[in-house]
Regions:
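Catalytic-core environment of secreted peptidases
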Residues: 127-139, 282-343
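Subtilisin-like serine protease catalytic core
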Residues: 19-21, 95-192, 199-204, 214, ...
Length: 630
């Protein structure tokens, strides 16, 4: 009897293995509430200190403006650095069709996938320079004000891009037009973000603002600051909560900010955090036929960050976007900027979480899975294959992302796992066609040590990645590596001949794979801080099925009977408690997945006659048994 010790990884059993519980109960059980509360207290102290410094500055400089408009751009003092005010600013200077979100809707609303995913029962937090106009008719009573402050056009436009109904004018329909929205101002955003997941079950938030570059020290360009670290700590602790940040509009400034880098190295602060989705802006795309269909806006800020990470992450339409405004309950207006692209992306995040929850007993995917899914399925953009510092991983494609979730276990793999220290996770996939094989890993990384963030150094290149995971694919003697970019030459094309040591998302693409079995391996560099690292694995292709491996138990730990079976299959074990199971057909496709009942009996009456495999799960372990259905 041969036993194989599993010390490499823990398999997160997808929510389809769990009893159906409410989202709130799930969050209460699976999120570290004590750590979140500690962060809230920390951020509140920082906010109080910052406000005291601002009050002191304006008592000495009463003629200065604390909050004002410059054209259509709202600016407000956020902090005092070396005696000078630093300002936040809004980034405003046919979204659903550009990113194919409309394909997820009901057929009566233009959907083509038969899903009816429109944001029903989903909630989004929108932080902005003011609040949205609650009473706008296109909000239909679905917007709630949390902070009592000024109603603003920008906040109303952003909120509308996410969830406006468009009942009177279809051009105003938001991406997730049946979702609920919470409107808050940006002054204490970090503190409020620590409570939004637990108090309001908000899985996605939008932040269409950032540091105003006018007058800001040049070292801020591309800098990973303490505010970015705070956001990363928050997302790491929250696990299921994913903020979307606008990349910024600094590329068309006159005079230009950071002119030495020719439009690159502009994204900074919270917008440069590792664990968020940073969104750039492009023109409308009516029919994507290839990379040249995606045209960059004149203003969208480009990466890299100072440590060379890929930013923006993705792009969406941000030019000439019509949406709701605050001047009246029926008013609308056209704005442009990464402020308008970001809420389109956030809306897609809501739709994909909704689709996943519909498939998985109302339980959400990890933030890392959602981010990885969006980046994995983005349409190619830019002058060369792979990512770049202008478009990131490309144009969001909600349809493609939804199809990956729908086909999990059939032509795609989506897994949430834990890599243990000094371990390697390995799986194999059977490829049945010559269309591209794509594998990605995504993880929510820990915040770096506080003394490593940038406090005034131009182009500080210290790596901010804490736990560095690496993915590679092998077939025989062939080895395939993920895409990487060279921050020293930001305009150069991406390469795929070495490991990526900067980003917490990695992607391998094999354009013309030979048919056969490929091995996907994930390992890590150095010692994993915390002893392990959760990560998400996404694999897609035209005909990709994960090979079943019997790797966890002794062969005699379980017995399956009768075999062949008619309507009921029984499993008996005297040594291990079975928690859940999956049934696969001979092509490796999942045809059933459920939790175990108290009798360890499985109803197989609906299965067609043939050969099947049942994968049994217990804690960290799994095993596969073959059976025949009469």
């Amino acid at each position: 009897m041969k036993k194989i010790l599993i010390a490499l990884f823990i398999f997160f059993q997808f929510s389809c293995f769990s009893q159906k519980v409410s989202l709130n109960d799930f969050i209460q059980k699976n999120v570290n509430l004590k750590s979140l509360d500690s962060l809230r207290n920390e951020f509140q102290l920082e906010y109080n200190a910052r406000q005291s410094e601002i009050d002191a500055y304006f008592s000495l400089n009463p003629s200065k403006k604390r909050r004002f408009y410059e054209g259509s751009v709202l600016k407000e003092v956020y902090s005092i650095i070396n005696g000078e005010p630093m300002y936040l600013r809004t980034f405003n200077d046919g979204s659903a069709k550009t990113i194919k979100a409309n394909r997820l809707y009901s057929s009566s609303n233009g959907g083509t996938l038969g899903l009816n995913i429109q944001g029903q029962n989903m909630k989004v937090g929108v932080w902005d320079g003011g609040i949205a106009r609650e009473s706008h008719v296109d909000f239909g009573g679905r917007v709630y004000t949390i902070d009592a402050t000024t109603t603003e056009d920008h906040a109303t436009h952003v909120m509308g891009t996410i969830l406006a109904q468009g009942t009177r004018d279809s051009r105003l329909r938001g991406i997730a037009f049946q979702a609920l929205g919470f409107s808050l101002d940006w002054n204490n955003d970090l503190g409020e973000m620590t409570t939004t997941l637990v108090d309001r079950n908000t899985l996605v938030s939008n932040h269409s603002y950032g540091l105003n570059s006018d007058g800001a020290p040049i070292w801020n360009a591309g800098a990973y600051t303490s505010s970015a670290r705070s956001v990363d700590a928050l997302v790491f602790t929250s696990e299921f909560y994913l903020p979307f940040f606008a990349a910024g509009n600094e590329r068309n400034n006159n005079p230009q900010w950071n002119p030495a880098d020719s439009g690159y190295d502009l994204i900074n602060g919270k917008n440069s955090a590792k664990n968020v989705v940073t969104v750039g802006a492009v023109n409308s795309v009516t029919n994507y036929t290839g990379p040249t269909s995606v045209v960059m806006s004149s203003f969208s800020s480009w990466g890299p960050t100072d440590d060379g990470r890929i930013k923006p992450d993705v792009v969406a339409k941000g030019v000439n976007v019509r949406s709701t405004i605050a001047s009246g309950d029926t008013d609308s207006g056209i704005q442009q900027g990464t402020s308008m692209a970001c809420p389109a992306a956030a809306g897609v995040g809501l739709l994909l979480q909704q689709h996943y929850m519909n498939l998985n007993q109302d339980q959400p995917m990890l933030a890392a899975t959602l981010k990885g899914l969006i980046l994995h399925t983005a349409d190619e953009a830019g002058f060369a294959d792979g990512p770049d510092y202008q478009f990131g991983w490309g144009l969001i494609n909600a349809e493609k992302a939804a199809n990956v979730l729908s086909s999990r276990g059939q032509t795609s793999v989506v897994k949430e796992l834990i890599l243990q220290n000094n371990a390697t996770y390995t799986t194999t996939v059977q490829v049945g066609s010559t269309k591209p094989l794509v594998a990605s890993i995504s993880w929510t990384d820990r915040a770096p040590a506080s003394n490593t963030v940038n406090n005034g150094t131009i182009d500080l290149q210290t790596l901010m990645l804490v736990n560095d995971l690496d993915v590679r694919i092998t077939k025989g003697s062939e080895v395939y590596f993920p895409w990487t970019l060279d921050p020293a030459n930001p305009s150069f094309a991406a390469t795929n001949s070495s490991e990526n040591f900067r980003d917490n998302f990695e992607k391998i693409e094999i354009a013309l794979p030979e048919q056969g079995v490929y091995t996907i391996s994930i390992k890590h560099k150095r010692t994993l801080v915390g002893g392990n690292q959760k990560f998400s694995l996404i694999v897609t292709g035209d005909s990709v099925v994960e090979t079943l491996n019997n790797t966890s138990f002794s062969e005699n730990d379980f017995k399956v009977y009768p075999n062949p079976a008619n309507n009921v299959l029984n499993v008996i074990s005297t040594t291990v408690s079975i928690e859940s199971y999956e049934i696969y057909d001979v092509l490796g496709r999942i045809v059933r997945n459920k939790t175990i009942n108290s009798t360890n009996q499985f109803d197989i009456s609906e299965l067609k006659t043939g050969v099947y495999f049942i994968k049994l799960f217990s804690g960290y372990n799994e095993t596969v048994k073959r059976f025949i259905k009469n």
